[in-house]
Amino acid sequence: MDQDEGLTAVDNIVTQFNTYEDFLDSQITTVDLYYLEDESLARQLVELGYRGTGEIVKREDFEARKAAINIARQAERTQKKTLTSAGKELHDDFLKALAMREEDNRAGKLSTVIFIRDRNPHGQEVSGYIDYAHRLKSEDFEVYFNGKRRLLPRTTDMSFYNWDSHIAVCNSSPNYQVIADNPEGLLFKYKRDRKILNVDPKAHPGDNSTRIPIQTDLYAHVVLFDHVSRRKT
């Protein structure tokens, strides 16, 4: 179905005219103006339904729909602007995987934890777990999707380890509580539904969680953990 066919009569009118007065003027004929000799009076009669050549639309209905349509358009523009991966020509599977998950992570529909192991600009081997949704909100991913910089773990991420200096850091994020004292290995508790994410490759990742190894030419080792919250809101 064409988009215009799905619009109501009010929607058609609202999208056609910038203001309610413009709509009223479109309903006034030259004959009306000739006899009434008052444009303001002619508008009032159209608004009351006594004059006019088409659909009767109340001022409050027009203005309410106009506001709703403007809000929807602004939200769409904001969403397109927010998705930094939109319109990018991505060749590496890792960047493609991040792009596929960007919108849902921003919207809170999905929570992705990124494990990366590789060498930093100093040649040191580092690894860590990144809260993708948190990073999306706290920094601009344009440089990563454009290939100008590589996404690497930081000491401010949920987990960071430098294999050369043996520096190890753990931090809870807005979305996850880090459980570092577990004898079987590192665990992350998702704060919204309190489900445990187990990143041990030999263990099941947990309820509503999926482990996805990624083949990439950009890093030595990449694994994504997708968690879908089932908490009722």
UniProtKB/Swiss-Prot annotation:
Gene Ontology, cellular component aspect: cytoplasm; nucleus
Main localization (coarse):
cytoplasm
- Pfam families tied to this protein: DUF4464
- Asked if the Swiss-Prot or TrEMBL record annotates the protein with the keyword Membrane, the reply is no
- Which regions span the lipid bilayer? none
Which UniProt key words apply to this protein?
Cytoplasm, Nucleus
Tissues with expression: Abundantly expressed in testis, specifically in spermatogonia and primary spermatocytes but not in secondary spermatocytes and spermatids.
Q: Which InterPro entries match?
A: DUF4464
Instruction: State if Nucleus is listed as a keyword.
Output: yes
Subcellular location field:
Cytoplasm; Nucleus
What domain of life?
Eukaryota
The free-text function statement in the UniProt record for this protein reads: May be involved in spermatogenesis.
Entry protein name: Cilia- and flagella-associated protein 299
Protein source organism? Mus musculus (Mouse)
Gene name as annotated: Cfap299
